[in-house]
Design a protein with these regions (language model features):
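Conserved N-terminal/central alpha/beta ligand/cofactor-binding core
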Residues: 21-125, 129, 140, 152-158
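Beta1/beta-strand and adjacent pyrophosphate-binding region of the FAD-binding site
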Residues: 2-15
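Short, hydrophobic/aromatic-rich segments at coil-to-beta transitions
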Residues: 131-136
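Core beta-strand elements of the Rossmann-like FAD/NAD(P) dinucleotide-binding domain
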Residues: 2-5, 139-148
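Beta-sheet entry/capping signal
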Residues: 7, 29-31, 147-149
Length: 158
């Protein structure tokens, strides 16, 4: 196996999945390192996408070619337009998703993306050389090298 990539993304949450997908779509040989492939883009106890603030972010991600909105459409179990009693400028779409389906759909997207590879293991440390990040070392000592490392280690670290 070749352990050299253009970009390594550490963390398989929402940001990590979007970053890895975008990098690979732009032609970079990309590695996504995650602690658990069955929990890619895991949603919190309130599995909602959209709403007043988050809805704006989802629309911006969508405009940039991201997949969060599409994955939401594939895994949604209920949809509601918030603030319908106010003017149209205040309306805000929100979807409740099936938590497992959301993660499964993200995995399908990532596994079907060319130039994107997924490695399940804990990232332990950055490899530094010549005052520059050169890669990532995992908990079992596997060393991956790259031109850039994106850290999206998020909040679900337990």
């Amino acid at each position: 196996m070749d352990f050299s990539y253009d970009i390594i993304v550490v963390g398989g949450g929402h940001a990590g999945c979007e970053a890895a997908h975008a990098a690979a779509k732009m032609g970079a040989r990309t590695l996504l390192i995650t602690m658990d492939m069955t929990k890619l883009a895991q949603m919190s106890c309130n599995p909602a996408m959209g709403g007043i603030a988050k809805g704006q972010i989802i629309r911006e991600i969508d405009a940039l070619g991201g997949m969060s909105g599409i994955v939401t459409d594939r895994s949604m179990i209920q949809f509601r337009m918030l603030n319908r009693s106010k003017g149209a400028a205040m309306w805000s779409p929100r979807a409740q998703c099936d938590r497992q389906r959301f993660s499964i759909e993200w995995r399908k997207v990532l596994e079907s993306t060319e130039r994107l590879f997924i490695w399940q293991e804990q990232a332990k440390s950055l490899i530094i050389g010549e005052k520059t990040v050169k890669g990532v070392e995992t908990a079992f000592g596997t060393r991956f090298y790259s031109r850039a490392v994106i850290l999206t280690n998020g909040t679900f670290l337990n």
